[in-house]
Amino acid sequence: MTARTLLVMAGGTGGHVFPGLAVARALRDEGWRVVWLGNRTGMEATLVPKHDIPMEYIQFGGLRGKGLLTKLLLPLNLLRAFWQSIGALRRVKPDVVLGMGGYITFPAGMMASLLGRPLVLHEQNSIAGLANKVLAKVADRVLCAFPDALPNSEWTGNPVRAELAQIPAPESRYDHRAGPLHVLVVGGSLGAAALNDVVPKAIALLPEGQRPVVKHQAGAKQIDTLRANYAAAGVAGDTVPFIDDMAAAYADADLVICRAGAMTVSEVAAAGVAALFVPFPHAVDDHQTTNATFLSKQGAALLVQQNELTAEGLAKTLAGLSRTQLKDMARAARGLAKPEATRRVAEICSQLAGKS
């Protein structure tokens, strides 16, 4: 029997690429042939081949923040991307096409629909991007990480790394801990300057006996500044540029302080850990605030806007949190998780491939 073929369309950021990889690996383990369509300048061009997934490329980018010339050339660039997408689809001959987001999904998704290829669309954020809003009108199935992000969609959750769902239940972790709280600060690959500045100062404002044990990840570009900030504040912190084992880091934490990207929010829920979200204030459509609100409005996380984040305020918040309160938040977060997201997205792809 000939192996079925999946074409994954995703690019630009890890929020699109990593969930796509999770589904790609799941279907490949079932014997599928997987090909990835992306942009040569996106992170997918470096990351995806490391997983032994062949690539097809098209040229297409966004308009936000671009000059007048780029906007004037949009029709020509779109026609080129349409043509390149048709070529890729004819070479790959996919049984099903999975769009996970990024600018390149728009021309490729439109051409997949035009050529009669089954199209599955997955929106990672709580507020859908423009490309997915348009593609949702022609897709065979529309899936969302957050409820009602797109009309007529199924809430599947975000595909996250499998080891996060395997972390023991919050009760078995929090109930057996004593001593100072363990706080994990995650700034991402680029770091988060606001967190790097405020957290050490907040820790310094607490009496020594009330200070948490802090692990603070800041990215390679920010790590020297972060270490200088801790030294200037006169407090201890395990400062690292990267964390290789995020599952272990989440499992060890009582509280995570982080941004509110779609994958971060989904990982926090899957891990079952309490979080204090500080949304990136310049995110498109302020979607990080909406992502964080999904958990915070149900008592599963705390939400502080960056313009309200101060050392004094954070110190007061930390001083007022008990491990029991954090356990309750962690339980609520785990209750909102969708641990079978990867499996569900893969199942839907299989269903549509069987009909093609």
Swiss-Prot record:
Keyword annotations: Cell cycle, Cell division, Cell inner membrane, Cell membrane, Cell shape, Cell wall biogenesis/degradation, Glycosyltransferase, Membrane, Peptidoglycan synthesis, Transferase
- Superkingdom of origin: Bacteria
Sites binding UDP-N-acetyl-alpha-D-glucosamine sit at T13, G14, G15, N125, R161, S189, I243, Q288
Gene Ontology BP annotations: carbohydrate metabolic process; cell division; cell wall organization; lipid glycosylation; peptidoglycan biosynthetic process; regulation of cell shape
CDD domains associated with the record: GT28_MurG
* Pathway(s) annotated for this protein in UniProt: Cell wall biogenesis; peptidoglycan biosynthesis
InterPro entries in the record, alphabetically?
GlcNAc_MurG, Glyco_trans_28_C, GlycoTrans_28_N
Which Pfam families does UniProt cross-reference here?
Glyco_tran_28_C, Glyco_transf_28
One example GO MF annotation: UDP-N-acetyl-D-glucosamine:N-acetylmuramoyl-L-alanyl-D-glutamyl-meso-2,6-diaminopimelyl-D-alanyl-D-alanine-diphosphoundecaprenol 4-beta-N-acetylglucosaminlytransferase activity
For this protein, the Enzyme Commission number is: 2.4.1.227
Q: State the compartments where it is located.
A: Cell inner membrane
Q: Name one GO cellular component term.
A: plasma membrane
* Entry keyword annotation includes Iron: no
| PANTHER family in the cross-refs | GLYCOSYLTRANSFERASE, UDP-N-ACETYLGLUCOSAMINE--N-ACETYLMURAMYL-(PENTAPEPTIDE) PYROPHOSPHORYL-UNDECAPRENOL N-ACETYLGLUCOSAMINE TRANSFERASE 1
**Entry similarity comment:** Belongs to the glycosyltransferase 28 family. MurG subfamily.
Functional note = Cell wall formation. Catalyzes the transfer of a GlcNAc subunit on undecaprenyl-pyrophosphoryl-MurNAc-pentapeptide (lipid intermediate I) to form undecaprenyl-pyrophosphoryl-MurNAc-(pentapeptide)GlcNAc (lipid intermediate II).
Q: What is this protein called?
A: UDP-N-acetylglucosamine--N-acetylmuramyl-(pentapeptide) pyrophosphoryl-undecaprenol N-acetylglucosamine transferase
Native source species:
Cupriavidus metallidurans (strain ATCC 43123 / DSM 2839 / NBRC 102507 / CH34) (Ralstonia metallidurans)
Starting at the broadest rank, the lineage of the source organism is: Bacteria, Pseudomonadati, Pseudomonadota, Betaproteobacteria, Burkholderiales
Source gene? murG
